[in-house]
Design a protein with these regions (language model features):
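Extended polysaccharide-engagement surfaces of secreted carbohydrate-active enzymes
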Residues: 1-181
Length: 181
């Protein structure tokens, strides 16, 4: 079904699909769909993991689960978004807060071997992710901090909340601090 949807998008034949809002608690993901766009917020807590790099794919995706907000059109313009990852600045994905000088360590062979390929990357203790939805609108929250386990010692912490309404998305952040500039 997904391959069919991608193929349809590549040829300008998309459908609006279901409209609504849903929080997927097991994957710390909120999906907000409307007739002309879809929003996906990917978050990470102690129960979920960072993106994995396998067989040379996702080599710079370690921040994708750090609150990234992806907005996709659901009309024929959706096809142009299929090639976007090729030109992304992986430290500046919409919605994430990351130290811009942190290395993409997760898939570095030397570091991975030294760590014994210790996957998955989990958030340090104390992180929280949650959300609520009535099926039409929703709210999601994430409290996270970088600095323990396999993550760089940036000391980055942040609380963020997302409110998704019919035609408005509000994102609020608080408590941002870091050991690095």
């Amino acid at each position: 079904a997904f391959a069919t949807t991608l193929d349809a998008a590549a040829h300008g034949k998309t459908s609006a699909g279901p409209v609504g809002n849903r929080m997927y608690f097991n994957s710390d993901t909120m999906v907000h769909r409307r007739a002309t766009y879809a929003v996906v917020i990917r978050m990470r807590s102690k129960k979920t993991v960072a993106a994995r790099c396998i067989n040379g794919a996702c080599l710079k995706a370690q921040h994708v689960a750090d609150g990234a907000i992806h907005v996709y059109p659901t009309d024929s313009a959706a096809a142009r978004f299929l090639s976007m990852p090729a030109v992304w600045d992986w430290h500046s994905l919409p919605g994430i807060t990351a130290a811009t000088d942190s290395p993409f360590f997760a898939c570095d062979p030397k570091i991975s071997e030294a760590l014994g390929y210790q996957w998955p990357l989990r958030m340090p203790g104390g992180s929280f992710v949650g959300g609520a939805s009535d099926g039409s609108v929703g709210a999601a929250a994430m409290q996270f901090g970088h600095g323990g386990g396999l993550l760089p010692q940036t000391g980055l912490v942040l609380s963020r909340s997302h409110f998704l309404f019919d035609d408005t998305i509000v994102v609020l952040g608080a408590g941002l601090s870091s050991k690095t500039p």
